[in-house]
């Protein structure tokens, strides 16, 4: 076959024709541009300006807990600070703390002519609840971990925190701040560094050692001012800045859950445990913070990070001397508003206060030069000379003068929204006496944004001091964002909120938080939210510790709590004290101890309990004294006039009768009943050797006790005790005995209940499981003068048994004078919002300092939104705001209208009361604007 030869040009033309036929552009240059040059090739290797290269952070040094800067010598330390609670504080107290803070700034740093120390304070509101939720989960006692009740609580609190931190806030606070209230944590961070030039002199410390010395002084001074400084590790620094420069990552999705997952995945990797070499690239600390290239916008003066515009607004000058806590402290605003300037700033604002520790001789020389230049008789010259003399005078009185700057970082989704936030910020600052630089007057806004980032500012390069201004150390202390709202101890046994939406955590059951005991007194007038608060506290403590709860109540305020606990796997035992209920309390059952341990029988006078010194010596139970109180209640019926008739001789005979009954019943091997003590009294009364008057008195007392041996009272007080089953929650409804006319029966029943709890505490004291005896409506129970001394007697040693006495009341008027030792014994006081006259009533039972009175008077309540209160203990003194999840509010509703709402749902839908309460909670979520989540499922619903 003959091969056919084709010309190469024909093949190329056919190739081009085929491409044209398919609509594909022809290959090759389609323009007449010049060929590439060597210069064009070189530009391939040129790097564009880098945002990250302007940041000085190179490497975290774990040995010195410092961040190495770009010069390879300078190091910086990062701290996270607690804040000083300013709510309800008096001016004198605030001034003392401010002076301590001022002294810390003045005394912690060495003043250097070259390379001075720089202090930067940053404050911002964050809604990242991850660290708290992880801390809460880790804090749960092993006994409660994994239980249905605990997991339900952890999920509920997580959903609640996410719901209340929505943009715009959960509600408008029209009573206190007149601003939206939003769940958020105000985080305050401190950065300390000094730029080093050249090699240190022979007598100088190395940069790391010098930083360590300064940080130790600074932390000690802050602690003296009541501020805890916690050193930030590399991961914590990285997490903070990662969120700053990546505010809206969408690599894994655009929702909050996806963003949180991104932050977790992008965390600084842990050092390898194996002996492997580090990577040769991408280990720069600053480079690891960026997952998108920042873009500069010189036209609008913003940086675009993650597609969001960022801007900084710098303070031009102070128009008036700042007050204590000027920016972040709670102060009066206008007629009746009480808030902080920072509360009024736009969301996502970051405050930065920079202070340069300037030598005083340099500043004095500058002042002298300024004074010499102010010549002439013009008004400006005279004013300048006066200001210079005043400044020199203040420096001479140990008020140091430094240089400083104040900046505010803003961000939003669009330029228009960012401009609106800038206007909002400027208005808030101007109203507070702070004049910001107008955005259009900022010469180099992109540089300013970089300048006030951590560790970027170098005082040596600011030769003309254009970017800082003179600032007294006292004014810096007033402006510092360490003023704020209380945060508690950090132990999340109980979690509440403050007025700014931040968390308050404390734990009476944690021995690090208590100094004496975990006994608790909760007082709240009618309508203050006492039932809801106590319900919320019990839910939290039960979820964290799974204690044994004994709840004594009148009015079924905790019936739904018991149903809820039972639906989640806790065992519940209910007792109702009413005729025909089949309950027997056996008030003299402990009399057998008098025979078993006769050497331990105490004969102390009950009145001696008013003496604190004698009370402190009571390391063992006074069983005989306790039983005497029970017998006296039966004899006198709880009536004051009958109690006054009792003489010391009568009391001695009562004790003798109890001992006689105990010995007789021990011989018969049976428990002591009320009738046995009655018979012992009659036996002594029938003794012919006794004086006639004594015999008559004894028979009268026996007849009085006989009332408890017949009729309805016999079933409850004159039978063998009914054994209590093992249960997580024991709910005792006082029923009939909570009414008027049953004072004696109520007191005796309560004593018997406390005895039963005490016996369980003694039996299980080695198991390590706490017991909490909760008494609601305490004013009904403790109004009997004999009962409070008894409670002091028996609960004095509960600290050793791990049992705690919690008392709640809404009425202080019914508490007798004898209740004072009982209330003084209690370390933890929670006082809900109350009128001024109630504060005065509290002072009857507890000495209140002026600061504590001021705190109590400042607590408020807004129906349907929140209730406030004050926590007082040996280690805490703070104001809190209760904003519980809707579920816990629904379980504590005791008003008639609220009960009717549940009853209507039960009738309409044929569900249990607990299921009706869960539905009420869902309706409350809708009213509060909380997004509906998956239905709450319990066994009872």
Q: Predicted regions: what is each one?
A:
Residues 850-905:
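Conserved P-loop NTPase
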Residues 223, 430, 542-543, 799:
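Anion (oxyanion) recognition and catalysis
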Residues 97-100, 105-107, 340-343, 446-504, ...:
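P-loop NTPase motor domains
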């Amino acid at each position: 076959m003959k091969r056919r030869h084709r010309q190469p040009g024909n093949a190329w033309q056919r190739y081009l024709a085929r491409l044209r036929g398919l609509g594909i552009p022809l290959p090759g240059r389609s323009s007449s541009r010049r060929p590439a040059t060597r210069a064009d090739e070189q530009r391939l290797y040129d790097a564009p300006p880098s945002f990250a290269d302007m940041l000085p952070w190179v490497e975290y040094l774990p040995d010195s807990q410092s961040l190495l800067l770009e010069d390879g010598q300078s190091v910086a330390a990062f701290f996270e600070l607690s804040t000083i609670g300013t709510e309800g504080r008096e001016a004198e107290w605030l001034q003392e703390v401010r002076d301590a803070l001022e002294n810390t700034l003045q005394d912690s740093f060495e003043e250097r002519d070259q390379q001075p120390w720089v202090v930067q304070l940053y404050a911002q509101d964050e809604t990242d609840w991850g660290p708290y939720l992880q801390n809460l989960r880790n804090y749960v006692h092993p006994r409660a971990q994994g239980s249905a009740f605990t997991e339900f609580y952890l999920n509920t609190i997580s959903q609640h925190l996410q719901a209340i931190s929505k943009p715009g806030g959960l509600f408008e606070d029209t009573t206190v701040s007149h601003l939206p209230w939003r769940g958020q944590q105000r985080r305050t961070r401190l950065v300390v560094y000094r730029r080093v030039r050249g090699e240190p002199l022979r007598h100088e410390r190395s940069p790391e050692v010098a930083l360590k010395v300064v940080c130790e002084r600074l932390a000690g001074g802050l602690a003296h001012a009541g501020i805890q400084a916690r050193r930030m590790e590399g991961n914590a620094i990285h997490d903070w800045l990662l969120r700053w420069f990546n505010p809206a990552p969408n690599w894994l999705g655009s929702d909050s859950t996806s963003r949180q997952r991104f932050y977790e995945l992008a965390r600084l990797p842990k050092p390898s445990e194996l002996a492997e070499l580090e990577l040769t690239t991408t280990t720069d600390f600053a480079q690891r913070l960026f997952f998108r290239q920042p873009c500069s916008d010189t036209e609008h003066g913003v940086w675009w990070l993650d597609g969001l515009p960022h801007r900084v607004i710098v303070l031009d000058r102070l128009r008036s001397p700042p007050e204590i806590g000027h920016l972040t402290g709670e102060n009066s605003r206008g007629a009746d508003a009480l808030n902080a300037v920072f509360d009024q700033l736009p969301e996502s604002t970051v405050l930065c206060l920079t202070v340069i520790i300037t030598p005083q001789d340099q500043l004095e020389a500058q002042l002298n030069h300024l004074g010499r230049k102010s010549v002439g008789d013009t008004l400006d010259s005279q004013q300048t000379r006066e200001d210079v003399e005043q400044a020199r005078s203040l420096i001479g009185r140990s008020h140091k003068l430094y240089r400083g700057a104040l900046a505010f970082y803003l961000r939003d989704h669009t330029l228009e929204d960012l401009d609106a936030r800038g206007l909002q910020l400027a208005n808030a600052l101007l109203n507070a006496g702070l004049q910001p630089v107008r955005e259009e007057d900022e010469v180099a806004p992109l540089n300013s944004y970089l300048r006030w980032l951590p560790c970027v500012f170098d005082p040596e390069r600011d030769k003309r001091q254009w970017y800082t201004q003179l600032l007294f150390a006292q004014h810096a202390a007033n402006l510092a964002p360490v003023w704020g709202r209380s945060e508690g101890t950090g132990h999340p046994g109980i979690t509440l909120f403050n007025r700014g939406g931040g968390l308050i955590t404390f734990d009476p059951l944690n021995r690090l938080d208590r100094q004496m005991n975990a006994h608790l007194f909760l007082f709240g007038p009618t309508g203050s939210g006492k039932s809801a608060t106590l319900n919320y506290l019990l839910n939290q403590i039960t979820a964290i510790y799974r204690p044994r709860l004994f709840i004594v109540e009148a009015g079924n305020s905790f019936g739904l709590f018991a149903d809820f606990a039972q639906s989640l796997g806790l065992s519940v035992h209910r007792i109702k004290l009413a005729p025909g209920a089949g309950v027997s309390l056996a008030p003299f059952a402990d009399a057998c101890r008098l025979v078993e341990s006769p050497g331990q029988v105490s004969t102390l006078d009950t009145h001696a309990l008013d003496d604190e010194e004698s009370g402190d010596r009571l390391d063992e139970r006074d069983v005989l004294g306790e039983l005497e109180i029970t017998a006296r209640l039966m004899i006198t019926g709880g009536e004051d006039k009958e109690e006054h008739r009792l003489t010391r001789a009568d009391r001695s005979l009562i004790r003798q009768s109890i001992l006689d009954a105990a010995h007789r019943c021990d011989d018969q091997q049976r428990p002591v009943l009320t009738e046995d003590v009655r018979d012992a009294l009659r036996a002594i009364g029938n003794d012919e050797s006794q004086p006639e008057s004594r015999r008559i008195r004894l028979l009268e007392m026996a007849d009085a006790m006989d009332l408890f041996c017949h009729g309805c009272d016999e079933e409850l007080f004159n039978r063998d005790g009914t054994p209590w089953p093992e249960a997580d929650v024991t709910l005792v409804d006082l029923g009939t005995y909570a009414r008027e006319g049953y004072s004696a029966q109520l007191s005796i029943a309560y004593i018997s209940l406390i005895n039963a709890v005490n016996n369980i505490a003694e039996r299980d004291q080695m198991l390590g499981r706490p017991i909490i005896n909760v008494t609601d409506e305490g004013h009904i129970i403790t109004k009997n003068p004999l009962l409070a001394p008894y409670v002091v007697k028996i609960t004095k040693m509960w600290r050793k048994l791990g049992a705690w006495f919690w008392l709640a009341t809404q009425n202080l008027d019914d508490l007798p004078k004898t209740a004072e030792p009982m209330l003084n014994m209690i370390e933890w006081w929670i006082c809900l919002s109350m009128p001024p006259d109630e504060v005065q009533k509290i002072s009857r039972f507890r000495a209140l300092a002026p600061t504590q009175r001021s705190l109590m008077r400042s607590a408020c309540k807004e129906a349907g939104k929140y209730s406030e209160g004050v926590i007082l203990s040996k280690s805490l003194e703070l104001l809190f705001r209760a904003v519980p999840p809707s579920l816990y509010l629904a379980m504590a509703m005791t008003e008639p209208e609220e009960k009717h709402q549940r009853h209507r749902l039960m009738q309409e839908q044929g569900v249990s009361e607990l299921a009706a309460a869960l539905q009420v909670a869902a309706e409350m979520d809708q009213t509060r604007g909380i997004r509906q989540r998956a239905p709450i499922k319990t066994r009872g619903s």
